[in-house]
């Protein structure tokens, strides 16, 4: 698993497997799930990640 934060785009990427991505789905606003050719999850992308973390800390 690899985790990367890009401050320029405010995107947090969590890559579970090194596999080519076949399709992506926005499962909720700002959360993308990328799937491989076998249908399994390859990567999660959190858009506006700093806002998501900020809201989580408020809970």
Protein language model regions, located:
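A short acidic/small-residue loop/turn micro-motif
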Residues: 20, 49-51
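A short, polar/charged loop-to-alpha-helix boundary motif
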Residues: 51-59
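Extended lipid/amphipathic-ligand handling interfaces
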Residues: 34
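Short, glycine/acidic-enriched loop or turn micro-motifs at the edges of active sites
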Residues: 9, 48
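N-terminal intrinsically disordered, cationic/polar leader segments
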Residues: 14-19, 37, 57-58
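Structured beta-strand/loop patches that form or line metal/cofactor-binding pockets in enzymes
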Residues: 2, 7, 14-26, 30
